[in-house]
C-alpha cells in the first residue's frame, strides 16, 4: 500500500510503499477513503521545534480521516466489516486518574494517531476498534474525515454554560474557528463576531457571523463594544496569537467566559489580576474531544443538517500530489484540504 511518512528528522514527507497491516486483538483494519491535512501535520512537515520534540520517525502521518472497515481482529464485535467510520485520533489508557474520572480527553497516557503511532495518510491503517465512530453510509467520506477536528469546535462551543442566547466573539478563523462559527449560529447565539487577519478565511465566516473583523484594519475592542454595547459574554479563542488572546479577554464583560483551544507557539505573559481575577472571568482550557459526548453532540448537528461542513472542503487532491496539498494549506489560501489515498 502507499503511505505518506516522516522517514527522517528533517523537513518534508515521503510517499512510500508499505505492507498492508493486519489487525490484532481489539483492532480493526480501515480502508482509508479520505484524509484531511491538519495544522499538526504542517508542524510535522516543517519539522519545527514541537515536531522535533515529539515525533519519532519513521511514522505514517495523518489523524483526520475516514473510511470503510475492511477487517476486524479477534474479539471485535463492533464496528463490523463494511461499516463506514470516522476515527477518534486519541487512544486513551482507561486507567489513569483522568480516565477514571471520565476525562478521557486529557488522558495522561494519550497516544495520537499520526503523531505517536501510524496514522491515516495511507491506503490502509490499523486502529483500536473503540476509536471508530460508525457513520450513516450516505455521509460523504470527505465530511466524515473532518468530524474529528469538528469535535474540537463542538467541545469549545459547548463548554461551560454554552452559547444559546449569548453574545460571542471568535478569535481565529482557521478551520476549527470556522466550524465553531457554524455551531454557534446553529445553537442560537448572537450577536456573533469573528476576527481574523486573513481575508480569505475570514470571508468563509460571513454566513454565520453578524460582524467580521480584520484586526489589522479595525480596532477589535472598539467594534465589539459598538456591536454589543458593552462586551461579549463568551470568547472562543482559536488563534493561539498573543495579541488576539489579550484582546479577546478584554472584550469580555465582567463575569464572562473564555474558552481557549488555540495554543501559542511560545509562552505568553498576561495580567492575571486585570484580565481575569478582578473581572470575574472564567477560563476553560479545551483539549481534544470529550469521549464520547462531543462526538454525539457534533454528529447530531451534522446528521440533522443543522451544520453543513462541506463549504469548508476547499480542495481535493490525490495523495500523489501531497506537496501541492501541503503548500496550499501553508499559504493560508485553503481551509480543509482532502487527500485521496487511492489516487
Curated annotation (Swiss-Prot):
It catalyses: L-threonine + NAD(+) = (2S)-2-amino-3-oxobutanoate + NADH + H(+). The keyword Secreted does not apply. It comes from the Bacteria. Keywords: Cytoplasm, Metal-binding, NAD, Oxidoreductase, Zinc. It is an enzyme of class 1 (oxidoreductase). SUPFAM superfamilies: GroES-like, NAD(P)-binding Rossmann-fold domains. Disulfide bonds: none annotated. Zn(2+) 2 binds at residues 93, 96, 99, 107. Zn(2+) 1 binds at residues 38, 63-64. Its EC number is 1.1.1.103. Binds 2 Zn(2+) ions per subunit. Contains one structural ion and one catalytic ion that may be less tightly bound at the site. PROSITE patterns: ADH_ZINC (PS00059). Homotetramer. NCBIfam families: PRK05396.1. This is L-threonine 3-dehydrogenase. It comes from Thermus thermophilus (strain ATCC 27634 / DSM 579 / HB8). The lineage of its organism: Bacteria, Thermotogati, Deinococcota, Deinococci, Thermales.
Amino acid at each position: 500500500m502507499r503511505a505518506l511518512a516522516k522517514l527522517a528528522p528533517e523537513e518534508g514527507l515521503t510517499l512510500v510503499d508499505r505492507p498492508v497491516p493486519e489487525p490484532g486483538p481489539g483492532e480493526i483494519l480501515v480502508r482509508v477513503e479520505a484524509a484531511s491535512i491538519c495544522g499538526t501535520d504542517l508542524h510535522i512537515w516543517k519539522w519545527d521545534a514541537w515536531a522535533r520534540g515529539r515525533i519519532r520517525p519513521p511514522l505514517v502521518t495523518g489523524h483526520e480521516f475516514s473510511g470503510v472497515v475492511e477487517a476486524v481482529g479477534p474479539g471485535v464485535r463492533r464496528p463490523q466489516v463494511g461499516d463506514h467510520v470516522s476515527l477518534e485520533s486519541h487512544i486513551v489508557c482507561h486507567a489513569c486518574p483522568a480516565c477514571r474520572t471520565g476525562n478521557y480527553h486529557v488522558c495522561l497516557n494519550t497516544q495520537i494517531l499520526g503523531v505517536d503511532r501510524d496514522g491515516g495518510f495511507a491506503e490502509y491503517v490499523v486502529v483500536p476498534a473503540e476509536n471508530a465512530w460508525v457513520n450513516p453510509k450516505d455521509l460523504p467520506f470527505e465530511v466524515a474525515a473532518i468530524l474529528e477536528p469538528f469535535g474540537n469546535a463542538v467541545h469549545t462551543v459547548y463548554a461551560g454554560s454554552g452559547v444559546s442566547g449569548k453574545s460571542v466573539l471568535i478569535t481565529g478563523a482557521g478551520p476549527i474557528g470556522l466550524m465553531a462559527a457554524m455551531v454557534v449560529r446553529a445553537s442560537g447565539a448572537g450577536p456573533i463576531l469573528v476576527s481574523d487577519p486573513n481575508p480569505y478565511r475570514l470571508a468563509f465566516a460571513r454566513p454565520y457571523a453578524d460582524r467580521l473583523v480584520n484586526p489589522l484594519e479595525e480596532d477589535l475592542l472598539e467594534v465589539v463594544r459598538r456591536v454589543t454595547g458593552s462586551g461579549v459574554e463568551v470568547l472562543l479563542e482559536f488563534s493561539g496569537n498573543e495579541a488576539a488572546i489579550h484582546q479577546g479577554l478584554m472584550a469580555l464583560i465582567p463575569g464572562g467566559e473564555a474558552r481557549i483551544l488555540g495554543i501559542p507557539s511560545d509562552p505568553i505573559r498576561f495580567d492575571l489580576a486585570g484580565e481575569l481575577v478582578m473581572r470575574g472571568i472564567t477560563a476553560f482550557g479545551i483539549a481534544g474531544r470529550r469521549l464520547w459526548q462531543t462526538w454525539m453532540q457534533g454528529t447530531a448537528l451534522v446528521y440533522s443538517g443543522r451544520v453543513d461542513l462541506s463549504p469548508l472542503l476547499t480542495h481535493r487532491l490525490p495523495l500523489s500530489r501531497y506537496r501541492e496539498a501541503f503548500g496550499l494549506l501553508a499559504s493560508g489560501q485553503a481551509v480543509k484540504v482532502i487527500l485521496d489515498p487511492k489516487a
